[in-house]
């Protein structure tokens, strides 16, 4: 089993457990970091055809599509045998909860390395992922690691790479410009936009089949090819969103051939972008404070950091207004995805749409509608923040076994009845930070998810990628392109973090401490 330099038995989250149940569970989950560790670029089990190449570094290098990373990695598990972008944030939180700051630093440095190499963080550490990214949480990883290590020199080295990634995220093809006809203000908002018009290599047959269904009634070869290319981009862009797949992206809410991801302005993505902007401004301020006062040689760095502080403070204020003007639905007290009608032959970089041309995408709520609260779209303790929490409470997404992703039964994995670790953590923390009078509700949400994950672990012996809020047997989530996965990186991270913050629930029928 691979050894991580800072892995120790009996971490604080297990030592501090109030009962035998939580101690046993936390200890097991902590052990899984060693199972999911990949210590170096040659730590591969098999090549792309499934041939065993363990111990054969040359075979691994020449047959694998993996991107070689400089530091030990912690992977999600099973079919996901390499680093994935947004998974890494919750893995980092779990590693820090396990008192493993060196490993957390390393997996974050792997993401920074990919920015240095490619100008952005790809979806995952595979060469075929270089045409898309994932929800941008690199700045959140850097923030978490810096908070744990207080390594100011490392932070100052990381900041320019966060700025470099931001330049990629705000490229013109990823930006939709919207004019508020009442105020006259022009807003720049983000969309997912993969740089490909071909099937995804990792899901080639599935994508080809979706494109075939989408074009089966077309006879003109040119028109058919055009539709297929758009479908492939929409599919890859949905994969970039992390919600692959969900009825969110489907025009009819059920069939993949109606996917139109690039024709949408997602509420959660723009929340994430706000968080990036806020993070960079705050981290620039932290870096400024860390600089020596009297050394002349750091003058240029001080000027640069002041520039970042001013630029990204302003950018976050502009983004906040844009989210409020375009994505907030005052009737439902939540943010919502909006759609726009693509123009034939349009160059998205040159089009300014009036806000009246945009339409809210889905009537029913999605867990992603509430993500902007976690990202700081509202002031902490504000009346509107509490209205958002009440909207979540009455949304029917919240069940006794966790927070469902949506109310739509589409058969896709990011829909009813699946509950996911990252969504749960974001909402629990959002309530903690922005609606502190609802701390009891945050604890209830954390405990409902912990009970479900624990039940599945006791029933199956594994931690899982997602959970079914309706399944009274083993609660393992299902649906989507592949069979349920075990491991599982971000589930382990959220479990440890919530156990540390809230302890194990005492009121579960089968899980009494």
Q: What does each model-found stretch correspond to?
A:
Residues 260-287, 413-436:
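Long, repeat-rich segments with strong aromatic
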Residues 84-114, 368-380, 424-437:
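Alpha-helical support elements that line or immediately flank enzyme active sites
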Residues 140-191:
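Acidic/aromatic-lined carbohydrate-recognition and catalytic surfaces
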Residues 115-158:
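Aromatic/His-enriched, Gly/Pro-containing loop or helix-boundary segments
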Residues 1-82, 106-125, 179-264, 322-419, ...:
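Extended glycan-interaction surfaces of carbohydrate-active proteins
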Residues 87, 103, 107-110, 134-137, ...:
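Amphipathic, well-ordered alpha-helical segments in soluble domains
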Residues 100-111, 151-170, 276, 290-324, ...:
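Extended, well-ordered alpha-helical scaffold segments
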Residues 93-97, 140-147, 275-286, 374-377, ...:
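Short glycine/serine- and small hydrophobic-enriched flexible loop segments
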């Amino acid at each position: 089993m691979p050894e991580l330099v800072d892995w120790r038995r009996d971490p604080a989250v297990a030592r501090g457990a109030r009962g035998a149940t939580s101690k046993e569970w936390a200890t097991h989950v902590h052990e899984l970091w060693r199972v999911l560790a990949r210590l170096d670029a040659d730590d591969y089990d098999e090549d792309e055809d499934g041939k065993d190449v363990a111990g054969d570094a040359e075979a691994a290098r020449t047959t694998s599509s993996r991107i070689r990373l400089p530091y030990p990695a912690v992977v999600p598990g099973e079919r996901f045998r390499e680093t994935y972008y947004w998974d890494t944030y919750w893995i980092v939180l779990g590693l820090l909860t396990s008192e493993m700051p060196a490993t957390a630093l390393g997996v974050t440095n792997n993401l920074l390395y990919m920015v240095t190499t490619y100008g952005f963080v790809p979806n995952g550490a595979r060469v075929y992922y270089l045409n898309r990214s994932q929800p941008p949480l690199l700045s959140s990883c850097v923030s978490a690691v810096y908070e744990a290590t207080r390594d100011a020199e490392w932070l100052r080295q990381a900041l320019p790479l966060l700025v470099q990634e931001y330049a990629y995220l705000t490229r013109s093809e990823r930006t939709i410009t919207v004019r508020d006809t009442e105020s006259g203000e022009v807003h720049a908002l983000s969309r997912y936009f993969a740089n490909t018009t071909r099937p995804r290599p990792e899901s080639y047959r599935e994508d080809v089949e979706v494109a075939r269904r989408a074009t089966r009634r077309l006879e003109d070869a040119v028109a058919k090819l055009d539709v297929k290319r758009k479908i492939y981009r929409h599919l890859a862009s949905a994969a970039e969103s992390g919600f692959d797949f969900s009825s969110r992206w489907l025009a009819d809410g059920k069939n993949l051939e109606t996917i139109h991801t690039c024709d949408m302005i997602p509420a959660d993505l723009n929340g994430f972008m706000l968080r990036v902007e806020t993070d960079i401004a705050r981290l620039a301020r932290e870096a400024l404070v860390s600089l020596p006062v009297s050394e002349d040689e750091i003058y240029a760095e001080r000027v640069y950091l002041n520039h970042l502080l001013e630029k990204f403070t302003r950018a976050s204020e502009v983004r906040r207004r844009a989210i409020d003007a375009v994505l907030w639905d005052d009737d439902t007290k939540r943010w919502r995805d909006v759609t726009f009608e693509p123009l034939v032959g349009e160059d998205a970089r040159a089009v300014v749409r009036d806000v009246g041309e945009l339409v809210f995408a889905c009537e029913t709520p999605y867990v992603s509608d509430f993500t902007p609260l976690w990202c700081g779209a509202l002031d902490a303790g504000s009346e509107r923040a509490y209205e958002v929490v009440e909207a979540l409470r009455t949304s029917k997404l919240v069940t006794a076994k966790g927070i469902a992703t949506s109310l739509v039964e589409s058969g896709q994995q990011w829909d009813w009845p699946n509950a996911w670790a990252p969504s749960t953590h974001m909402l629990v923390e959002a309530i903690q930070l922005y609606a502190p009078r609802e701390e009891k509700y945050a604890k209830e949400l954390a405990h409902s998810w912990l009970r479900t994950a624990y039940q599945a672990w006791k029933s199956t012996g594994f931690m899982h990628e997602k959970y079914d809020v309706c399944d009274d047997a083993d609660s393992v989530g299902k649906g989507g392109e592949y069979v349920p996965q075990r491991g599982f990186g971000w589930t382990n991270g959220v479990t440890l973090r919530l156990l540390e913050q809230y302890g194990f629930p005492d009121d579960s029928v089968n899980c009494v401490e």
